[in-house]
Amino acid sequence: MGARLFTAVLPSADLVEELDHFLTPRRQAEPRLRWTRPEGWHLTTAFMASVTDDGVDRLTEALAEVAARTPAFRLRLGGGGAFPWPRETKVLWMGVREGEDQLAALAERSRNAAVRAGVRVDGARFVPHLTLARASRAIDTTRLVRVLDTIDADGWTADELVLVQSHLRDRGNRYEVLHRFNLSTDSRD
């Protein structure tokens, strides 16, 4: 079996601190959720469940080209959501208030780069989000989603794309950044 990889944009350290502080009392109030660790927060642009060593090399080259052609952009999180929906939540997430179109374009480019590299991309349509928590059994998080809707987090400049390996563990995945690709700062892109 190959490496379990994804491409992503990482939130700024300031946002991680702000959101972590906001969520602290919510974590204590909802123990039925398995809350994700702030150091693992990311906005996935493409997921690849099994990539060979050769595939990683080809993917790395293709992603470097994508990043060089993609201008850095402003991102701001806000609003809550749940998969499949708030009344039967399996995944609780924070949405994107600013930069959604640019993030979606980067996701499409990341996915296309993987396909060009001969790597199978998993997942259905792209829904920009940052996963906050998961539930073993579906629970009603309508109240939490409403609370998340009140967040108007500080924004940041998304200036890199990362290629991450996900190591599966019983007590939450461990993420290892394999490569960082700077997005273009050339305003002509």
Task: Describe the role of every protein-language-model region.
Residues 1-189:
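Histidine-dependent nucleotide/RNA phosphoesterase domain, centered on the 2H-phosphoesterase fold
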